[in-house]
């Protein structure tokens, strides 16, 4: 069956794993104290300018346990702990997206998407009318859109790949990435329930690949420089690629 739908992981698949751990996470932790110091604690949810980034941050923080948001210090310590332990918390992910937005818009952050990935994202949707690319990441959908709207293509001017993408999924809209039910939910949402084999999911994390395969879709392991090595015995039964240019779809 011909593959006409590709779902892409981000970190370690289409951009270096170091981008998240060495650029995005540290930027968030560095900016967090300044951001929290501009907010009144206990939280005031009656901010008139509901379109402001600060209002969005306050609304997001209000979803944390009340015992956490008694002060800027306690809020910082709680969030820093989530980051340090790589906890896939939806409130943290939403807050990260809001703070990263400032970095992207100021030009401090640009997304180092691999050239082969840029090429694939630009060309695959143009092959046939039904060829589509979706993104599935633990990061919030807003953070995903920011990443793809500020891609470093080597010209010094950020490029926007969002027009080539048909949709986005995160842990709030699909579920956790190591659970087969999450991929089943995506299959339903993109109207591929009776055509799962026309869908391909790409990830550097073998547990995600296994979960995707269990749902009925195809899935390949992507190996990139700097990724955590996967034992050969775990890779033995999987299709492996080292670049999206290897895809013959």
UniProtKB/Swiss-Prot annotation:
Domain of life according to the entry: Eukaryota
Originating species: Lodderomyces elongisporus (strain ATCC 11503 / CBS 2605 / JCM 1781 / NBRC 1676 / NRRL YB-4239)
CC terms in the record's Gene Ontology section: cytoplasm; nucleus
Compartments, record wording: Cytoplasm; Nucleus
Pathway assignment: Amino-acid biosynthesis; L-methionine biosynthesis via salvage pathway; L-methionine from S-methyl-5-thio-alpha-D-ribose 1-phosphate: step 3/6; Amino-acid biosynthesis; L-methionine biosynthesis via salvage pathway; L-methionine from S-methyl-5-thio-alpha-D-ribose 1-phosphate: step 4/6
Cofactor: Mg(2+)
Residues where Mg(2+) binds: 9, 11, 204
Annotated substrate binding sites: 137-138, 177
Reactions the enzyme catalyzes: 5-methylsulfanyl-2,3-dioxopentyl phosphate + H2O = 1,2-dihydroxy-5-(methylsulfanyl)pent-1-en-3-one + phosphate
Pfam families: Hydrolase (PF00702)
Functional summary from the UniProt entry: Bifunctional enzyme that catalyzes the enolization of 2,3-diketo-5-methylthiopentyl-1-phosphate (DK-MTP-1-P) into the intermediate 2-hydroxy-3-keto-5-methylthiopentenyl-1-phosphate (HK-MTPenyl-1-P), which is then dephosphorylated to form the acireductone 1,2-dihydroxy-3-keto-5-methylthiopentene (DHK-MTPene).
UniProt protein name: Enolase-phosphatase E1
Lineage, top ranks: Eukaryota, Fungi, Dikarya, Ascomycota, Saccharomycotina
Gene Ontology MF: a single term: magnesium ion binding
NCBIfam families for the chain: enolase-ppase
Protein EC: 3.1.3.77
Major localisation: cytoplasm
Quaternary context: Monomer.
Family to which this protein belongs: Belongs to the HAD-like hydrolase superfamily. MasA/MtnC family.
Example GO BP: L-methionine salvage from methylthioadenosine
């Amino acid at each position: 069956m011909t593959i006409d739908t590709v779902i892409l992981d981000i970190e370690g698949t289409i951009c270096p794993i170091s981008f998240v751990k060495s650029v995005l996470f540290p930027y968030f932790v560095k900016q967090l104290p300044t951001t929290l110091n501009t907010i009144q604690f206990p939280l005031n949810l009656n901010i008139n300018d509901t379109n402001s980034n600060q209002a969005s941050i306050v609304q997001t923080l209000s979803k944390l346990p009340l015992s956490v948001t008694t002060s800027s210090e306690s809020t910082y310590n709680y969030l820093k702990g989530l980051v340090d332990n790589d906890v896939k918390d939806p409130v943290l992910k939403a807050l990260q997206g809001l703070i990263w937005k400032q970095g992207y818009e100021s030009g401090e952050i640009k997304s180092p998407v691999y050239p082969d990935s840029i090429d694939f994202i630009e060309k695959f949707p143009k092959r046939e009318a039904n060829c589509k690319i979706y993104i599935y990441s633990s990061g919030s959908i807003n953070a995903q859109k920011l990443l793809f709207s500020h891609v470093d293509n080597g010209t010094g001017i950020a490029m926007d790949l969002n027009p080539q993408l048909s949709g986005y999924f995160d842990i709030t809209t699909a579920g956790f990435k190591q659970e087969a039910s999450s991929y089943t939910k995506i299959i339903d949402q993109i109207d591929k329930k009776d055509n799962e084999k026309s869908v391909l999911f790409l990830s550097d994390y073998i547990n995600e690949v296994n979960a995707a395969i269990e749902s009925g879709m195809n899935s390949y392991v992507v190996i990139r420089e700097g990724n955590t090595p996967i034992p050969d015995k775990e890779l033995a039964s999987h299709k492996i690629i080292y670049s999206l240019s290897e895809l013959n779809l």
